[in-house]
Amino acid sequence: MAKFTVCLLLCLLLAAFVGAFGSELSDSHKTTLVNEIAEKMLQRKILDGVEATLVTDVAEKMFLRKMKAEAKTSETADQVFLKQLQLKGLPVCGETCVGGTCNTPGCTCSWPVCTRNGLPSLAA
């Protein structure tokens, strides 16, 4: 929902920009501007997917390393990952805060979006 809201806001801003300055821009400039914005939005979406994949992969490797070392500790793999890489509040849970609460387990409200306290479970 948050990504949709941001996309809608960008489209409205683009429409306002083109409407306000449209007479000063040629059709080729308008097309170039729209194409550049669309390309940047696509790149952002791709990078978000890569980031989520990397976080999950690193968490799995750290968990396996800890299992192989047979360290006797009460820390979970999520806590170790947070301490070593200082990733606090990542990744985004994929929902917006409603009344300061989040429906997804393990997520807290970091207005306007819900963020995880730790990492997604390895089964996800």
From Swiss-Prot:
Propeptide boundaries: 23-88, 118-124
Cell membrane among keywords: no
KW Transferase (keyword) present: no
PROSITE patterns given in the database record: CYCLOTIDE, CYCLOTIDE_MOEBIUS
Domain of life: Eukaryota
SUPFAM superfamilies for this protein: Cyclotides
Tissue expression profile of the protein: Leaves and stems. Lower in roots.
Signal peptide range: 1-22
PTM annotation: Kalata-B1 is a cyclic peptide which occurs in three forms: with unmodified Trp-111, with Trp-111 oxidized to form oxindolylalanine and with Trp-111 oxidized to form N-formylkynurenine. Oxidation is enhanced by exposure to sunlight.
Keywords: Antibiotic, Antimicrobial, Cytolysis, Disulfide bond, Hemolysis, Knottin, Pharmaceutical, Plant defense, Signal
Cross-link (Cyclopeptide (Gly-Asn)) at residue(s): G89-N117
SS bonds (residue pairs): C93-C107, C97-C109, C102-C114
InterPro entries in UniProt: Cyclotide, Cyclotide_moebius_CS, Cyclotide_sf
Coiled coil feature spans: none
Family that this chain belongs to: Belongs to the cyclotide family. Moebius subfamily.
Function (record text): Probably participates in a plant defense mechanism. Has antibiotic activity. Has a diuretic effect. Has a uterotonic effect in humans. Active against the Gram-positive S.aureus with a minimum inhibition concentration of approximately 0.2 microM. Relatively ineffective against Gram-negative bacteria such as E.coli and P.aeruginosa. Inhibitory effect on the growth and development of larvae from H.punctigera. The unmodified form has hemolytic activity, the oxidized form lacks hemolytic activity. If the protein is linearized, hemolytic activity is lost.
Record remark: domains: The presence of a 'disulfide through disulfide knot' structurally defines this protein as a knottin.
Protein name, as recorded: Kalata-B1
